[in-house]
Amino acid sequence: MDIKKIRLDFPMLNNKTMQGKPLVYFDNGATSLKPQCVIDAICDYYSNFTANAHRGDYDIAHKVDQTFDAVRSKVANFINAKDKEVVFTAGTSMSINMVAYGYGVKYLTENDEILITEAEHASNVLPWYKVAEQTGCKVNFIELDEKGRLTVDNLKKALNSNVKIVSLAHISNVLGYDFDVKEFSKLIHEVGAIFLLDGAQSVPHKKVDVKDLDVDFLVFSGHKMCGPTGIGVLYGKYDLLNKMDPLMTGGGMNTKFDMCGNIGYQHPPLKFEAGTQNIAGVIGLGAAIDYLNSIGLDVIEQREKELKRYAIKKLKEVDIITIYNDDNDSGIITFNVKDVFAQDAASLFNSYGIAVRCGEHCS
C-alpha cells in the first residue's frame, strides 16, 4: 500500500485548516473524505450526461439507465447479494426506518418483542420505539458485558419465542466492538425472528458477505465509505422485501393505479424507490466501491489495525488519557483526557488541525 499516493487521491488533505494547519482527519466514523475519482464521477454526470433514470427514451437517458443499473450490480457484488435484493436509500437511517415501518409496523403485535442494545446508534433505536408506539410491541435490550461487548450468552438470555426482530450494529460507532454475527444469526433464526445488521461502521472497512453471515437485512451509507452523502443501501432477502410495504409511494414504484384507489406495486427493489432517485449519489457510490476495491478491503482492514495499534501505544504513553476500548477489532478509539471536558479537548485538538468526534456520538 502506497500511503503517500493514496493521500494524494483526497483533495481535502491538500488543504490547510482555518488555523493554517495541515488537516489530520480522525472523524471517519461520522463521514469519510472523498477521493477525486468520486468527485469526478459525480461532476461527470452533472456535466456530461444529466438525465432522469428509467424515464427517458434518448441516448443520454439510456446511458444514465445503464450506469444506474450497473451500480446496483456493483453493490450486490460488494456484499455478495443479488441485484434484486439491493435497494437504494438516502442512508442507513432511512434504510432502518424502511424496515421498521414496512415490516415492523405491518407484522408486529402487542405480544411481540424487538431486541437491540444500549450501545446502538440513535438511528437503530428511535425507529423501533415508534414501531412499539404504533403496534404495542416491546423494545427490550440485550445486556452487554462489562466492556460493552455483545456476547452469545447474553443473546441467549434475551431471546424467546416472542422476539420477532433483532437489530444490531455490526460494529458500534462508539466502542468499535465486533461480534460473532454468524452465530447470532443462527440463534436468532432458531426462535423465528429476523435479523437486521447495521453495517454503517463495518461495510466500509472489511468484507461483509450477506450470504455467509445469513442476515435478513443489511443497511449502510455511502458517505462513510468514501462516497457522497444522501445515498445508502438496504439489502434484504428477497422474500422479506416482497412482504414489506413501501415507506414512500410515488412515480416509478407502481405498475398501475386507478380512480378507485387500487395500486399495483413494482417488484423489489423498484417498489421501494419512489420518485427521482439520487442519481448522482448512486454514481458516486459506484465510484467509491471501485476505489475501495482497487486498494482491497483486506489491505484496508489490515492497515487500519496497524494504525490503531500504533495510536493506542502512543496514547498510553500520555498519563492523563484514559482509553476505553484498546482491545476492539476495529479502528475506532474512544478516550478521554482526565479532568477535561470532551468538547474542550476537541477544541484544543482542532487548533492543531486535528479533527475528532466528541460528545455522545448519537448513542
Please annotate each region the language model reported.
Residues 1-363:
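Pyridoxal 5′-phosphate
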